[in-house]
Each structure stands twice: as structure tokens, then as C-alpha cells.
């Protein structure tokens, strides 16, 4: 019985130490942006919200003061990114909602549409395929609203070759 009581005491101590490191508070970034949320030490770490000086808002995960994990960034002009972050950059799987009502769903790498992704254009057209630094690049299929398609290679955001 004493053995179990001792184990419970150790577990309670470890649990208290772990939660004592994370607290809720505010943090001011050097650029004047204001953060409210979980802090570890004096830096954002965990869930929180930052209101940037220009009116942009980020709500999501932080690690050691940087956006990392899942989060939503709403730009002051109405555009929005919902997805994964790494080292303060859009990185991983995410969706970007453009002001002109286009929507990109797919992979991101250091703030660029990179890898497999789909662009839904405001006029009903759809592109499914590879992206490189925000441009259609490699294999992809563009389908016009009326049903016609181009299936083939892309380079510098333009059809490259005959395609099908």
C-alpha cells in the first residue's frame, strides 16, 4: 500500500511541475504585435492569439515564440490561411482563401504553394497538380467550367507542351 501511495505522490509532483511551466499571459513582440495565450517562460508556447500592428490576426499553436502546428492567419484585407505552420511560415497542409474568391488546398513549403495542390478558381475552373513557389509546375490537370481539360506539363504557371 505504501508503495502505491509513493508512486501517486511522485506522479502528482511531476504533473504539478509540468503544468507550472505553462501559464496564461500576454507578450509583446518587438514589432508591436500583441499576443495573448499560453506562455512557457516568457515566450508564446501552446495555444494563443496574436493581433499584429497592421490588423492581421493569428490564432493557433506556438512553439518557443514562433507559429508552429495548426493555426489560422486572417489578413486585414480578408484573405485567410488555415493550416499547418513551421518556424513562423505556412508549411505543410493548408488552405488559402484569396480575396478574389479563389481557394487553394494543398501543400505549402516556407510560405509557398509547393507540391500537390488544387486551386478552385472563382469562375468555376479547377487546377489539380503540382506547384512550385506559387506557380503551376510539373504535371497537372486544368479543367474549365464548361468541361474542357488540359492534362499535361506546366512550367512557370503556363501550359508547357502539347498535353492532352
Regions found by a protein language model. Name each.
Residues 49-51, 72, 95, 118, ...:
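Extracellular beta-strand solenoid repeats
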Residues 34-44, 57-68, 80-91, 103-114, ...:
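Conserved anchor residues at repeat-unit boundaries in beta-strand-based tandem repeats, strongest
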Residues 4-14:
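Sec-dependent N-terminal signal peptides
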Residues 20-57:
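N-terminal segments that cap or nucleate solenoid repeat domains
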